[in-house]
Design a protein with these regions (language model features):
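Active-site histidine-anchored catalytic micro-motif
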Residues: 1-137
Length: 137
């Protein structure tokens, strides 16, 4: 059996945001005993990621690393009409990707103790983000 739902995550400022609980609240119940959850964000300037959920410094450090890797206002950018943060956001999105697949075991997301789901928002003002969640049983 396959179930699917679409929902919006609330708008976030630029940065890496722990959204595990916000996503979990939107998932249809009950989750299967064994299955897979695929999450897909329908945007090109943000990404989904799994990272450490305990120390908030990880979020700050990830933002700093990404900004160091992909800088704004580079003279070779041609796609600039949507602002100086837009082309770097597309590049960062391509590095991280727009989907995650998480195993479901015993009716729960089977993630490690220190793992959480992140929305990495690469725009200064990205707005709400549309997520498609597909559960495979």
């Amino acid at each position: 059996m396959i179930r699917q739902t679409t929902f919006h995550l609330s708008a976030k400022r630029r940065g890496c945001h722990l959204v595990t609980q916000e996503i979990f609240e939107h998932l249809p119940r009950p989750l299967p005993q064994v299955g897979m959850l695929n999450l897909f964000v329908q945007h090109t300037s943000c990404s989904l990621s799994i990272n450490e959920n305990y120390d908030p410094d990880v979020r700050t450090d990830m933002e700093a690393i990404l900004n160091h890797m992909v800088k704004e206002r580079e003279p070779y950018y041609e796609h600039t009409m949507e602002g100086s943060d837009d082309m770097p956001a597309h590049a960062k999105c391509s590095l991280f990707g727009v989907s995650l697949t998480i195993p479901i075991t015993d009716g729960r997301l089977n993630m490690g103790t220190w793992q959480g789901i992140y929305l990495c928002e690469f725009r200064n003002h990205g707005g709400s983000r549309k997520i498609v969640a597909t559960i495979y049983e």
